[in-house]
A protein has these predicted regions:
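Structured mid-to-C-terminal alpha-helical surface segments
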Residues: 1-15, 26-34, 38, 42-248
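Glycine-rich beta-strand-to-loop/alpha-helix junction loops that act as flexible
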Residues: 17-22
Length: 248
């Protein structure tokens, strides 16, 4: 479905991919966790109906049928389904943000290839530089209660060539005046560390849990690398090595 969307001229020129599936299937050499939803953001503010029509046509070519279309605020959700060969149902959801058309960086293209006994193809996928992907991921970590966001940030900060300064600059760009401060992030993350659902969210999604991954250590890294760059942040020595947790 990712490749079919990227090969469609109308959709390729309008939809830019981001989110967990994009991170693990497109940006990383080896996917580290499972993500079923395909997240996109639009380049323009024109009507959405022609693109939904085109999505239906693309889905039909790969044997999927639209089971639901829903719009909630700035998000349009299109759910596709099909009967799996081994029984059960295949479900894919395309989530499109129709409001955020002002990007921080120029978009890029990354070639993606699928070669299996069922289907093969390749295409250049429109997406964002990894720093901007992590800006969105940092916002998601703050706004929702999903441990997968912390895992993805930890993974990028420890294994990829990302710039904390660029991540926070992109965050400021996307959130404008509503960007959270260091004390707000500190309290937000501290509360989430005490939530069992947040801590175990990643377990059902992970391909193989890295031995070095630890929820507390991941939160410490986020505060040291990104939190320190936010408004009202104390000196790094008051944040590092988990000391930010004792100040809450």
């Amino acid at each position: 479905m990712i490749i079919e969307i990227a090969e469609n001229e109308l959709l390729r020129d309008e939809f830019v991919m981001r989110g967990g599936t994009c991170l693990h299937k497109i940006h990383l050499k080896e996917p580290r966790r499972y993500s079923e939803d395909l997240d996109y953001v639009r380049r323009t503010n024109t009507g959405i109906k022609p693109y939904i029509t085109e999505l239906r046509a693309v889905a039909d070519r790969v044997g999927l049928a639209v089971s639901n279309v829903d719009r909630s605020g700035s998000m349009v959700h299109v759910t596709f389904g099909a009967d799996a060969t081994g029984g059960g149902r295949i479900r894919i959801k395309v989530e499109t943000n129709i409001a955020e058309t002002d990007f921080f960086n120029k978009t890029i293209e990354i070639e993606h290839e699928v070669d299996s006994r069922w289907w093969s193809g390749k295409a250049k996928i429109p997406t964002f530089v990894l720093d901007e992907m992590m800006s969105t991921k940092t916002r998601a970590l703050y706004q929702r209660r999903k441990g997968r966001d912390l895992f993805d940030l930890w993974l990028a900060l420890t294994s990829e060539d990302v710039s904390p300064e660029e991540i926070v600059a992109g965050l400021r760009h996307s959130m404008n005046e509503s960007i959270f401060t260091y004390p707000q992030l500190r309290q937000n993350l501290f509360d989430k560390l005490a939530d069992a659902g947040f801590r175990t969210d990643i377990e059902a999604l992970i391909v193989a849990m890295p031995d070095e991954y630890n929820v507390e250590n991941a939160a410490d890294l986020v505060m040291e690398k990104l939190g320190r760059l936010l408004e009202n942040a104390p000196p790094l020595e008051e944040i590092a090595d988990g000391r930010w947790r004792s100040m809450t």
